[in-house]
UniProtKB/Swiss-Prot annotation:
One matching Pfam family: Asn_synthase
UniProt-recorded name of the protein: Microcin J25-processing protein McjC
The species this protein was found in: Escherichia coli
Domain of life: Bacteria
Asparagine synthetase domain ranges (all copies): 176-436
Entry annotated with the keyword Signal: no
GO-annotated biological processes: antibiotic biosynthetic process; asparagine biosynthetic process
Gene Ontology terms: cellular component: cytoplasm
Function: Along with McjB, necessary and sufficient to process the inactive microcin J25 (McjA) precursor into the active peptide.
Name of the coding gene: mcjC
Length: 513
């Protein structure tokens, strides 16, 4: 723990932080940083940021800062904290009188305030269970606040926060998803070799071809398990061979050992895996444990490009182009997803009646999905160095897809249609039109079946059933069906409930408040 005493408009403030954030201080300026900050295409240190702050001011810095980072800046009467657009190190703060506690870990905030009781934020828990990622700085723990991706927050001399910007208020640079992926990869490049986690699906294929086009050398890792379809591995291997890319397959299988959870220190339920995987070192390839590799993956593509767009897009289609166009898009969607036309129509009519003018439930759901994706994935090694990231979760791509109407994400035959078409036009490979991977639902059902007792016990012991007024009979019925018979529409709720229960357990949260 370190303490900096500063003044905001003659009011004395203490900044208390854990040493996981590297700090640089001059007489009038403090910069604390974790991750990799980039300005004008070049990495910058805390000292370099401080120098620009003193020469040009805080506003100039935050307008031109890119990368994957969280940051605190103090300069004379300005105190700001912020986070990059790209999913990166978390940043939390807690206020106590004229003290502000800052860390990238919720557990550190709790450790620095042993006399405070941190209880479950019931409202945020309900939003989490419903899948609604609302734009707020509140966390799941009362009294602890989070900085969301792309946000910069300024504090006045009473430590009242004011939001200066968020990820959806930033202007995108171009409309090309592929150009943005290239820019994002180049921004994060260092002297390490690149390893692509390549499944052979659309999202990893996008990164595969952008790496090839931009002249980056890389190897491809393909994970498989005893339950995998061998055709997926052979397809990925042959595809890499066709383009002269080294291919390494690694055998990973499910590990149901619940003790592994107690090695976690999660900041949110989304960081808690449904299951752990173990690597078989005697498989066809060695596990990717090389510290000199920067791993790229296609995580987030499903959410951002609209893998499962909200069926309430019909409201937007009707408002934009009329009744016949809405009919056409609903027919396309029902054919693509195998849903009943009548059900989609009824859900749109019901939502339309209960929706205010100008409100787009489909767009709200899509933006919520993108925020969920950008919050879920980011990894550093034990030194804090970035070792795994996804090039999709960045402002140009997020901004572009936030600006598209949901009904434009697909046509009758292909989901994620705009990105498939752009990639095919640019690279000429038919991989972008293929469904190369099997559905993950079989694997999820196997995991839930194997964890049935643990799932039930964790949820019951968390206290969530009582505190949130959950009907335990209905819950038991839903749990039974999803773990023994088939997956249902309640699957996302079940997964969120389990992760939230685990989060309460691992963070020792007083759910009773």
């Amino acid at each position: 723990m370190e303490i900096f005493n500063v003044k905001l408009n003659d009011t004395s403030i203490r900044i208390i932080f854990c040493k996981t954030l590297s700090a640089f201080r001059t007489e009038n300026t403090i910069v604390m940083l974790k991750g990799k900050a980039v300005s004008n295409g070049k990495p910058v240190s805390t000292e370099e940021i401080a120098r620009v702050v003193e020469e040009k001011g805080v506003s100039e810095v935050i307008e031109n800062l890119d990368g994957v980072f969280c940051i605190l800046i103090y300069h004379f009467n300005d105190l700001l904290i912020g986070k990059s657009i790209q999913s990166g190190p978390a940043l939390f703060y807690c206020k106590k009188n004229m003290d502000i506690f800052v860390s990238d870990k919720i557990s550190d905030i709790k450790f620095l305030n042993p006399d405070m009781t941190f209880s479950l934020n019931i409202t945020m828990a309900e939003h989490y269970l419903s899948g609604n990622r609302i734009a707020t700085q509140e966390s799941l723990i009362t009294g602890i606040y989070k900085v969301n991706n792309g946000e910069f927050i300024k504090f006045n001399n009473q430590l009242k926060p004011v939001l200066l910007r968020d990820e959806f208020s930033i202007t995108k640079k171009n409309n090309s998803t592929i150009d943005s992926i290239i820019d994002n990869i180049e921004m994060m490049r260092d002297n390490r070799k690149i390893a692509l986690l390549f499944s052979g699906g659309l999202d990893s294929a996008l990164i595969f071809h952008t790496l090839k086009e931009s002249g980056n050398k890389f190897c491809a890792y393909h994970f498989f398990s005893d339950e995998s379809d061998d055709s997926e591995k052979y397809f990925a291997k042959e595809y890499c061979s066709k383009y002269g890319v080294d291919f390494i397959s690694v055998n990973k299988n499910i590990n149901f050992n619940e003790k592994l959870y107690f090695n976690l220190n999660p900041n949110s339920p989304d960081e808690i895996p449904l299951i752990f995987e173990q690597t078989d070192e005697e498989g066809e390839g060695q596990p990717p444990i090389d510290d000199d590799l920067l791993y790229l993956c296609g995580h987030g593509g499903d959410h951002i490009f609209g893998q499962n767009p909200s069926e309430l897009f019909g409201i937007d289609a009707y408002r934009s182009h009329g009744l016949m166009f809405m009919h056409k898009k609903i027919v396309e969607f029902s054919n693509l997803k195998g849903k009943r036309y009548k059900d989609i129509i009824f859900s749109n009519i019901s939502a339309f009646i209960n929706t205010s003018n100008g409100c787009s439930p489909a767009k709200q759901e899509h933006v919520s999905d993108m925020k969920l994706a950008s919050a879920q994935f980011f990894a550093t090694d034990y030194t804090g160095k970035i070792n795994k990231l996804t090039p999709f979760l960045h402002k140009n791509i997020i901004q572009h897809y936030a600006g598209l109407p949901v009904f434009s994400l697909f046509n009758q035959h292909f989901d994620r249609y705009p990105v498939r078409y752009e990639a095919f036009q640019r690279f000429g490979s038919d991989i972008f039109w293929k469904k190369t991977k099997r559905s993950s639902s079989q694997l999820i059902f196997r995991i839930l079946s194997g964890k049935k007792d643990e799932l039930v016990n964790t949820i019951k012991q968390s206290g969530l059933i009582e505190i949130l007024g959950i009907n335990h009979i209905e819950l038991e019925s839903i749990l039974y069906e999803n773990t023994t018979t088939r997956l249902t529409m309640e699957l996302p709720y079940i997964l969120n409930l389990y992760r939230l229960a685990k989060f309460i357990q691992l963070q020792s949260i007083d759910y009773k408040g």
